[in-house]
């Protein structure tokens, strides 16, 4: 245990004052990266007593033509002996004595050279001319350092073994999750995505290499990395993927069926053969074993199995091995070192027959502390077979084409584990399931490992106490409250228009809409259809309407070629349903329109009378036109009133009727307006609504007992002057007034609406509802009788 004295503590506080935060929780050498131990090992391999090693780290840089940083990957040789992003962190986290900035290295080298009395060399990895150390007249060796470091890196210390074991644990959990979900997937990209998801959630953001998710024939390509094809009817998936934890790698491969059981006898046979190759080779692992011998053993087992399956024939095991035909199905080596690199360094290839220099250890024999992979495989590469082995008479005579064609759909099978060589045997660091355990996980559909949080099925789901603690991403402090770490639930409300959208990724909210007046805007097609209804006249009709005395038009005609304004009683015909009307495109009746315009002018004249009470309107000529043939008095009176020279009495008995009829005639199609203003109520006016009140009069003579709501269909006609208006007979106007009088009394403050009579298809109607103020001084009956007289 390191003891902090006053001097060292003061030095650390000095670093803190400069803005560096020192991690006092990592004080013991066992918790630090063993950089000193690695340096002593390199010194031992170099066989020197004194010297200086110069290594430069990776320089951070941006992407070309961009201000965004490029992915940073520290140089492994540099990291092996030092590492660390800042001076303070390097001093505390890594087992070193002194730390300097790069621009201070040159001065340090000069001081070292003068104090060493030329007794040591300066060791570099590369040509010193390419390094920034300059010329210090010191002897520089750029040849010996890399081989020595390669040999040193082959043997892992306890700290490195711990990191590699951690990387294997995370990768094994990811493989388990893939197995438990493989029956849900249909594409290679989904497999890769889930694997990366699990690794990142366990603080292993970087992968040791690009994952290989090869299905079917793609498994015959050793370094396939497209990972984007559908499974279809393919049989197997070969997943070669391993994460990196604190720069130390893992390398794991599993091959599994894309169904709950082996899809074919051929697939099961090849898997059992590869499984036997790996098991027998792993059992032979021990210190002092030459790894090349295990590679040869794997080939012999493969040849025996291929002969038994009938893929190879016409030769003995020795003949086929000497011819090299087995490499058509097992083309790579049995394994490699693993450490800071997925294919970690060594003095020579792991399966090389040559030995190293006398000063260096032999590289092809296993030693305690090595971590190697054992990854046999059998592949059916159509490209390699067609272009190299089948055209060659040396190999083609041993290959049975008839049997080979049955095995081509298998693609390839590889099984790979990371093995630590111990003092007497080995330890398998990989815990990813294989064999029967693998099939059981696929069949169950779950892995029994809480590697990733279960997906929240609803934003309202309460988190129970039995849920495992959430995993923290890199950089999140352990003291962060759990409430902050919990995933944010998606919004629990949505527009009412979208409630019917059923999606697994969007949870509908069954409550009220946030927008009280929300209405969906019309689409382009709807706008075009609406414009055509308003502007394009047509004589086509799809409604079979039988004229009836119950539905009488304003003009007195019930022709079907035009759209009339009807006067109907307040009740719906029996047996009709609301909302059953169909939109029709018909030209408006000119006579109905002219009558409505005339009534509108009358309303305007009556409303102007309120502004000038002293001027009274004489309405008797209008009503007495039935007996007097002078039409000119009506038109002149209307024109005179519109100019505003005269006004009606404020309480004219015609006020409410004129206002009501004009409002009914002039409201636009499908318009929805608010309630009448106070001024409108005082004037006896009305505004159309989607809904009306169904009031029943207490009197038995009231024909408006069942007045119902209506919808507006009549388009807004023009209110400009029409010459034909002057030629209207007073008889037609009088008939309209008398018809309204016969439909019911004029008492009360009522409302009327113009629109399509609900339950009667295609009938725009003037509904004489009981919310229409007609008179204050007398009844319509009295006025009509005086007009008749």
Curated annotation (Swiss-Prot):
- Tell me the Pfam families matching this sequence: Peptidase_M24 (PF00557)
Residues reported in the UniProt entry to bind Mn(2+) 1 = 251, 375, 416
Cofactor: record remark: Binds 2 manganese ions per subunit.
- Which key words tag this protein in UniProt? Aminopeptidase, Hydrolase, Manganese, Metal-binding, Metalloprotease, Protease
Q: Where does Mn(2+) 2 bind?
A: 240, 251, 416
Q: What InterPro entries does the entry give?
A: Creatin/AminoP/Spt16_N, Creatinase/aminopeptidase-like, Pept_M24, Peptidase_M24B_aminopep-P_CS, X-Pro_dipept-like
Keyword check for Membrane: no
Q: Which residues form the signal peptide?
A: none
**GO molecular function terms attached to this record:** aminopeptidase activity; metal ion binding; metallopeptidase activity; peptidase activity
Query: Which function does this protein serve?
Result: Catalyzes the removal of a penultimate prolyl residue from the N-termini of peptides.
- Identify its protein family: Belongs to the peptidase M24B family.
Recorded protein name is Probable Xaa-Pro aminopeptidase SNOG_02267
Report the source organism.
Phaeosphaeria nodorum (strain SN15 / ATCC MYA-4574 / FGSC 10173)
